[in-house]
C-alpha cells in the first residue's frame, strides 16, 4: 500500500488510509518506504511503527527501503520487525533508486529479509 506518512500527509495518512482500507474489507497492509523521509534506516522504520501503533485501525507492517548506500542498515534490520526489503530498480523517491550493480549484489547477498522489487523500465512505462 502507498500511505503517505510521514511527510506527505496532505495526500493521506495512516489513520485515514487504514480506515478506507477497512471500509473496503482490507484488514492488513504492508506499507511502502517511499515517503519523506524515506524508510531507509532502522531509525525511520521504528518511527513508522510508533506512528502506526497510535493511528492505524488495521494490522500493519512496513518495508525497509533499499538504496545504493544503506547496506549496513539492511544487514542490521530486525527480521521480526520489517515485512521485507523494498528495492526500486526504476525511478523512485529521493535516494531510493538502486541502480548500482555492486549495491544490488550486496542487497541480494546480505539482506536478512525477503527482497521485493519494482523492476519496471522507465522508458517503457
Predicted feature descriptions by range:
Residues 35-46, 50-125:
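Histidine/acidic-residue-rich, glycine-tolerant segments that coordinate divalent metal ions
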Amino acid at each position: 500500500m502507498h500511505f503517505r506518512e510521514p511527510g506527505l500527509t496532505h495526500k493521506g495518512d495512516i489513520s485515514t488510509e487504514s480506515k478506507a482500507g477497512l471500509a473496503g474489507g482490507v484488514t492488513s497492509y504492508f506499507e511502502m518506504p517511499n515517503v519523506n523521509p524515506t524508510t531507509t534506516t532502522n531509525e525511520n522504520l521504528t518511527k513508522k511503527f510508533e506512528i502506526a501503533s497510535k493511528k492505524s485501525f488495521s494490522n500493519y507492517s512496513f518495508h525497509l527501503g533499499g538504496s545504493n548506500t544503506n547496506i549496513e542498515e539492511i544487514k542490521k534490520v530486525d527480521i521480526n520487525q520489517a515485512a521485507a526489503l523494498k528495492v526500486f530498480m526504476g525511478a523512485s523517491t529521493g535516494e531510493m533508486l538502486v541502480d548500482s550493480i555492486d549495491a544490488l549484489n550486496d542487497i541480494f547477498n546480505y539482506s536478512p529479509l525477503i527482497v521485493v522489487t519494482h523492476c519496471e523500465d522507465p522508458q517503457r512505462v
